Curated annotation (Swiss-Prot):
It is a multi-pass membrane protein. GO terms for biological process: protein secretion; symbiont-mediated perturbation of host programmed cell death. One of its GO terms (cellular component) is plasma membrane. Keywords: Cell membrane, Hypersensitive response elicitation, Membrane, Transmembrane, Transmembrane helix. Belongs to the FliP/MopC/SpaP family. The keyword DNA-binding does not apply. It comes from Erwinia amylovora (Fire blight bacteria). Required for the secretion of harpin. The keyword Cell membrane applies. The chain crosses the membrane at residues 11-31, 52-72, 158-178, 185-205. It is found in: Cell membrane. The gene is hrcR. This is Harpin secretion protein HrcR. InterPro entries: T3SS_IM_P, T3SS_YscR-like.
Amino acid sequence: MNTEQFDPMTFALFLGALSLIPMLMIVCTCFLKISMVLLITRNAIGVQQVPPNMALYGIALAATLFVMAPVFNQMQQQFSQVPADLSSMDNLKTSVTNGVAPLQKFMTHNTDPDILIHLQENSVRMWPKEMSDSVNKDNLLLVIPAFVLSELQAGFKIGFLIYIPFIVIDLIVSNVLLALGMQMVAPMTLSLPLKMLLFVLINGWTRLLDGLFYSYL
């Protein structure tokens, strides 16, 4: 980082931007989708607090670091080649743009093109003409929200598929208890251990995380 000559206002903005890193870690990486799928899976099984939220977020963070490791490595190389220059706002903008290029490429690759086009059309309607005319599909102002929406949509699609077999187990257990005249027995009492057994037998956690990893190839 070049700090021999720097503008105080630029330096203050740079420090403020660093405080946004935790939020960017959520919205600009695979953390959002992975954490959503893990939480939905826990709810589908029926164990509301096992694993606890902190444990699931820790698993999601570890999985995110695994998936994003090549991207972070490329960003580190970019910043090493072109250190942040705080001498002016334009130089800082150029340094940051070059540094986040690998992350932007990752988000663009994993963004639904239809969502990106839709947001670009909305920008034409909502933004001033001189601003919307200068924005293309590679602009972070479009890529970040499009990526977030794509991750949300993909997470709910995966969650729906995860719910199906567990709902089938609930229905089967309920019908069997009804046929046996055991209406006083709560279906969850029997379906919960069956769902946990099924998930363990198919090595569910490993298969689930593998599927999430491969979705970013």
